[in-house]
Amino acid sequence: MRTKTRPLAIVLLVSALVATTVPAQLVVTSQVASASSATPSSIWSFDEFAKHMKNPDVSLSWGGDFRVRNEYFNNAMSLSSDPAVSPLFGPNHEQEYLRFRGRVWASLYPSNNVTLNLRLAAEPREFLKPAFSDTFFGSTGMQWRYGIVDNLNVQWKKPFDLPATLTVGRQDIFLGDGWLVGDGTPEDGSFTYFLDSVRLTYVLQELHTTIDAIGILQYARPDEWMPTIGSSGSVPGQPAGLLLTDQNEKGAILWVANKSVPAANVDGYFLYKHDSIYLSTLAPYGDNGDIYTIGGRLSGLPQDHWKYAAEGAYQLGRKQDPILNQDGENAQLPSGAQTTGFRDIDAFGLKGKLTYLFKDEWNDQLSLSAEYLSGDDPNTKKDEMFDVLWGRWPQWSEMYNIYSYVPETRVGQTADLIRFGPTWGVTPVKKMDFSLSYYALFAGEDTPTRALPFAQPAFSDSGDFRGHYLQAILKYKFNDYVSAHLWSEFLWEGDYYTKQQMMDFLRAEVMFTF
């Protein structure tokens, strides 16, 4: 990290600490004719003041947050610092930038059962080194990105006196632990994560069962059906402009969750996703496909000190991927597997986590995680790559399963992965959490069939060990309004990669919430 920006993390954390001393002592006096006429009942604590400000009337509530991040990484997306191996990203293998995300939201309650929800968001970024992606590629300085209506929906509780909730519009949807449904906008990098959708949640109280039926219509462009605040369109050399996701998407979800047995919560689901290429003239963007996913999840607390979660899913359907199905011969495929049309999908994924809760003074926890996502076999005309659908978010790594998959598949399109290892979590002092994780990472297939043409030299095509992954996270919540964290990740590359260099990722964050 550059010397002049290295103190930023310290400055942010110190400012947060100073900010926390104010609410504890601040009192706000209600409007009176003079200060001397104030009575004890007219003096509010900061918490009371904030509550009254955010809920000025029974028909309105509002709030906001402001997130500041300083992020640095090296080789995470280029996979190597050698331009000969990574000609596009190699020259910009080292990245440092600031992210300033602001959001404000409001809810209107026209009746007891109906709520109108609105949220606006914007995240300008300042690149301290030449930018690595999108319309700002190769530039430094402030990137004044667009603002967007991040949420806009109507929620109707107990429609027609049914034990249900109907939500229509732009909304956040997170099912299970987000493995396959958690983020509808992976291309904007945690700036937003909404899905344009209709969701009906039906509760069978006596059966301890919840049924979710969801329909999705998601566009690649952020201004497709609702204008953005500021330009999000194309610029010379970047005809795609800024994207939310890689293709236009339609989907249907049926998700049933039963919690009758605390030791064995059962989820079963069917997911359908239809992909339609956004720009037919741009091979790297998106795919055409119809993906059908059938899966289930089991989780619970079988004993006082143990908890677990296990999930598995199988996929079928068909997909046409421009990167794989390009005109002419694909260098990654043998002659018998060449195709330019749709391929039948035959893929599956598994994941699990077992945690021991010490329940001691420091709240020690020790977990063992494992995950398998099938990869595409280059020797067949089928598509064996498991698609994580709307799960392209940093589920276990802010670095590897987001940036490092860009040359291999797409942003957050984690696939062809075998991952296992432990995590230790502890709360050494009140409001502070620390965790340390190690994962051994492997590939089921040693040839990344979807690697971008300019990135193929970065892969050895002969090894299956992705590398040793290490993560350390320190979080602290100062109060209800200020929190912060320090985040670090490292990967020592294995023989899956040509150069076998080290990747690293560092972040300092402060979040202000009102």
Task: Enumerate the predicted regions with their spans.
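Flexible glycine-rich, low-complexity coil/linker segments exposed to the extracellular/periplasmic environment
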Residues: 380-416
